[in-house]
Amino acid sequence: MNRTFDRKAYRQELIDAGFSAEDAETIASRTVMRAPRETFQSVGSMVQQATAKIERDSVQLAPPALPAPSAAVERSRRLEQEAAGLAKSMTIDTRGTMTTKKRKTAGEDLAKQVSEAKQAALLKHTKQQIKEMQLSLFDIAPWPDTMRAMPNDTARSALFTTRNKKIPREALQNKVIFHVNKDVKITYTGVELRADDDELVWQQVLEYAKRTPIGEPITFTFYELCQDLGWSINGRYYTKAEECLSRLQATAMGFTSDRVGHLESVSLLHRFRVLDRGKKTSRCQVLIDEEIVVLFAGDHYTKFIWEKYRKLSPTARRMFDYFSSHREPYPLKLETFRLMCGSDSTRVKKWREQVGEACEELRGSGLVEHAWVNDDLVHCKR
C-alpha cells in the first residue's frame, strides 16, 4: 500500500543507521525526486507487485483442463488397469506403469518451466523498473564511504582464489565454481581471478560506481585506484591495475539460485577502456553490468571496513568474506574452506596451520572478536 513519504524522517533514519548527514540528505533528496509526488514506492514493493502480476499471468501458462473422458476411453483405462494387475501378479513390467511415470515427469517438467518463466519475467520487470527510476547501486544497497560491499553469493564462492602467485592463472571455460550453498550454481568463463588483487579492484570499482545511475559509465584515474587500494603509485602498479580491470571485463558468469533464478551471462565489469591513453587527461571508463546489481537486492550483501579489510592476506580475507556474509556465522569445515579458497594445498596439516594463521590475523585486525580452529572446523565470533 502506498504511503506519504516523509523526507525528513527518512533522512533521520539514515543518519541513525550510520550515514553522514550529507549522504543522508543526498539519498533522501534523490528518493523524493524519483518517487511520485504524494507517494513513495520501495524497490521491495515493486518486486512484490511484479510477483503478483506474474502469478496472475502464469495461470495462462498452465495446461487447459482436460475434458471428461468418453466411455470408450474409460473402458480402455479399465482394461489397462486389469492387465497391469494381472502382469503384476506375474512379475511382468507394463507399459501402463511407464506411461504413469512419463505423465508424472511431464507434469514436473511443466511446473519447472512455469517457475522459470515466472523468475525470468520477474527479473526482467525488476531491471526495467530500476532503469526507469534511474536507481543507483547505493539506492538498492547503501553503504558508508568508509566501507566496501559485495554480494553474499560471491562471498561464499571460489570466484576469487588464493592460489600461489607463482602459479600461472588458468584460462577457464564454463567451469563450475565451488559454492558453499548447494542451491547456488556458478559457471565461469575467463582468466582465473585472485583474491590478492582482482577481488579488491572489483570492490573499489563498485565503490566508484555506487552513486551513479545503473547503466551509466563512471570514470576514475589509475592514480585514484592505486591510492584507494593502498598500492604504490608507479608504472608497475598502474599496469597491474589495468590487468585486473581487463580480467574483470573479460568474464562471463552463469548464475542460478532459488532466490535469484537464472542469470545467463553476467560480467563482473560490463565494459572497460582507457580514455586519452598516454595523456595527462587519461582516465579509466567502466560500466557495471546491470544484472550484478540483482545479486545485491533484498539486503543480500555484506559490508566491511575497507581500511582493515584490504590489508588482510588473501586467505584471511576469504575467511572474513564467508563469516561476514552470515548474521550468525556457522562453523566451516577446513576442507570446505579450502575449496572455497580454490587452494591447491594437498597436505591437511599444512592447510590447518595456514588457516590457524589466518584466524590470528583476522582476530588481530579487529574485524571479528575471535576466530579459531577446533578439530576440523573453523569457528568465528563476530
UniProtKB/Swiss-Prot annotation:
Lipid bilayer topology: Peripheral membrane protein
A GO BP annotation: DNA replication
Annotated spans, Hydrophobic region (HR): 286-297
Coiled coil: none
GO molecular function: DNA binding
Quaternary state and interactors: Forms a dimer in solution, binds DNA as a monomer. Both mononer and dimer of the short form interact with Hda (Dp).
Protein name: Plasmid replication initiator protein TrfA
Species of origin: Escherichia coli
